[in-house]
């Protein structure tokens, strides 16, 4: 895939948000997308509108244990750190080493944040960090392009790890996953965010 074409899309996208995006962050994102589009799942980082739609679903006052799946360049991570309680534990999962590096460099001294690679191992990393159950799981994973067995394993791990009143908040670029999520969760609220590239469905799921 031609990074010049992608870069032009991001340039246009940045002006629709009314600001210039961080050059290093976005060029890294573009390169990783061009190399592994199935892993990255999107041509651009999430917009501020999608970020707000996702993270406004979280009860920040009471959320002490949070996991983020598929952190990318850390757009959500950055806002999670801002909003979270001082004593919150945040498990951040990102499989791409270059994107992991960006997140690690941005949050070198956050004592409650730990960085991991494989979201399928969510339960193991919770145990390692002294967490019994999670209050919220925030997901940017591109489930529709992941191997089906991997998607099942990740969703099973999420259901297992959430508190009974916990929420799974995820976005997707199509409604394909809606019926899958309905099989895992008893309740769901859906929101469509037009101001994102591409537009996205936000699913807030709980049991």
Where do the model's predicted regions map?
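Conserved SAM-binding loop of SAM-dependent methyltransferases across substrates and taxa
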Residues: 73-85
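Conserved beta-strand signature within the Rossmann-like core of class I S-adenosyl-L-methionine
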Residues: 165-172
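Core SAM-dependent methyltransferase catalytic element
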Residues: 193-207
């Amino acid at each position: 895939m031609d990074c010049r074409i992608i870069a032009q899309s991001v340039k246009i996208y940045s002006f629709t948000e009314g600001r210039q995006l961080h050059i290093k962050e976005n060029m890294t994102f573009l390169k990783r997308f061009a190399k592994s589009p199935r892993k990255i799942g999107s041509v651009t980082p999430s917009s501020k509108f999608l970020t707000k739609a996702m993270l406004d679903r979280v009860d920040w006052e009471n959320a002490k244990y949070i996991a983020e799946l598929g952190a990318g360049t850390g757009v959500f991570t950055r806002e999670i750190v801002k909003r979270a309680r001082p004593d919150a534990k945040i498990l951040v999962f990102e499989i791409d080493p270059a994107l992991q590096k960006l997140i690690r460099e941005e949050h070198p001294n956050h004592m409650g944040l730990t960085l991991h690679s494989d979201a399928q191992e969510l339960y193991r990393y919770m145990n390692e960090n002294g967490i019994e159950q999670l209050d919220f799981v925030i997901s940017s994973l591109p489930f529709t392009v992941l191997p089906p067995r991997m998607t099942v394993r990740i969703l099973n791990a999420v259901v297992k790890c959430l508190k009974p009143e916990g929420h799974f908040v995820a976005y997707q670029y199509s409604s394909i996953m809606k019926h899958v999520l309905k099989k895992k969760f008893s309740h769901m609220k859906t929101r469509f965010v037009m101001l994102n590239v591409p537009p996205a469905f936000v699913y807030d799921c709980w049991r």
